[in-house]
Amino acid sequence: MYPFIKSIHSYFAWAALALIIIAIISTILTKNKESVSYKKWAFFGLMAVHIQLLIGLTLYFLSPFGLDNLSGDSMKDSFTRLLAVEHPFTNIVAIILITIGYSQSKKAEYGSKKILVFYTIGLILLLSRVPWSTWLS
């Protein structure tokens, strides 16, 4: 079960990141303030990161790198700490920021600015804590 969910988490991450990047680009390219295309991409990106979060939380509780590694000894190893603490915490914060950006954009007169700022910060946070050594192998 663990390898299957790990594969889903790894492959779906590409889709989630792509949708966030497309949302940011479509927001930048939006010239007409009344256009709704950037909002659609922002919504798809929002849904993708939330699905990725659910898959990731499932993986966290099934993984040998999850709750079992919250002891003092595992915190000394940078890779184990990345998987057990830094990756989940930072990604949850990034998803919260993306959610805030989408929700604020619905209330703002020019929502594209909110999406641009919050989605970009969220993307930077997501990319900063990807375990690149295992993800690309």
Model-inferred region functions:
Residues M1-S137:
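Membrane-embedded alpha-helical bundles that constitute the cytochrome b-like, heme-associated redox core
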